[in-house]
């Protein structure tokens, strides 16, 4: 029976009970299985389009030379749009600029009235300006050394006097503003 042509076997199919008894696999059972797998493959491949396939194939191929590798990297960078996190990383890596290096920033311009007003406030407090302290620090850095006992005691007295004058001025400003508000 198997030696006959396949189309004839499918037409002259014996009942299933006889096939089970003979132990021979049914010829029709193989056909739906192969069709099902083909149908499943078509469904799986329909999920992906040709662009995806080409993209996957391009990334899996290894470049033949270093020049093409660099070109691929440049193309990927050009295609990639910068996102929020990329911009954040760039901002983090950028060195902070000094105020004089920032575009459009200019140091404040003091008028003669501002300078006179600063000197009159120092005169009101009764403390002389700290010119001696400034003279000590001109030769070195902007910090003063307190290792010398004479300079440390002088510094502490002057700073205490200056702090008291600042407190008095700030209290005066607070009381004046409170009275104006009432």
UniProtKB/Swiss-Prot annotation:
InterPro entries, per database record: TDRP
Q: Which Pfam families match?
A: TDRP
Which parts of this chain are annotated as the region Disordered?
1-38, 52-73, 95-151
Q: Where is the composition biased (Polar residues)?
A: 59-70
Question: Basic and acidic residues compositional bias: what residue ranges?
Answer: 116-125
**Any Gene Ontology CC annotation:** cytosol
Q: Which domain of life is it from?
A: Eukaryota
Transmembrane segment boundaries: none
User: Which tissues is this chain's protein expressed in?
Assistant: Strongly expressed in testis. Also detected at lower levels in epididymis, bone marrow and kidney.
Residue ranges with Low complexity bias? 22-37
Summarize the record's disruption phenotype note.
Answer: Viable with no gross morphological defects. Morphology of testis tissue and mature epididymal sperm is normal. Sperm counts are also normal. Sperm motility is reduced, however this has no significant effect on male fertility.
Please give the residue positions where the record annotates the modification Phosphoserine: 7
UniProt-annotated location(s) = Nucleus; Cytoplasm
User: Which controlled-vocabulary keywords does the entry list?
Assistant: Cytoplasm, Nucleus, Phosphoprotein
Q: Which family does it belong to?
A: Belongs to the TDRP family.
Q: How does it assemble?
A: Interacts with PRM2.
Per the entry, what this protein does is: Contributes to normal sperm motility, but not essential for male fertility.
Name of this chain's protein: Testis development-related protein
UniProt organism field: Mus musculus
